[in-house]
Amino acid sequence: MRVLVACEFSGRVREAFSKRGHDAWSIDLLPSELQGQHVQGDVRDFLDDNWDLMIAHPPCTHLAVSGARWFKDKLEEQKNALWFVLNLMDAPIPKIALENPISIISSHIRKPDQIVQPWMFGHPETKATCLWLKNLPKLEPTNIVEGREQRVWKMTPSPTRWMERSRTYTGIADAMAEQWGAKS
């Protein structure tokens, strides 16, 4: 299966699919942290390239409700971010999963099909992740664990905090590849 992982610099989801024999590519404006099939560029230039599945991680900077106190000052940025999300959702790709934290996508476009937590996939942490799905089943939990630490939320400010907050948990990446990759 040809898999596009949009807006991913970590390479985690791409590699989860690659390990299972898929032709998986990540595309992001940043270079990839992991070696592999990665294009540094604008994903919109690649949406028509005959993909079977896309997992999209649009930047949450102007979408996440955690930044609600600044919403009034960034209406134009929100409008552009929502337009980008619509571009991804409307891509000519048969199967699509778009992920983002709790965000204005829910109130401006549509409610998510599913909300998952890292603790459902082997990581003893909380970080609600919404999934908007097209022709894909909901993810089934793979390893429910105890512990509900808010590690990501408690991170101290730093220049790289946003990068750590945006990395997909490996348990979730593996579940996507195992469950959605098997449904080809």
Q: Positions of the model-derived regions?
A:
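Conserved active-site and SAM-binding loop architecture
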Residues: 1-184
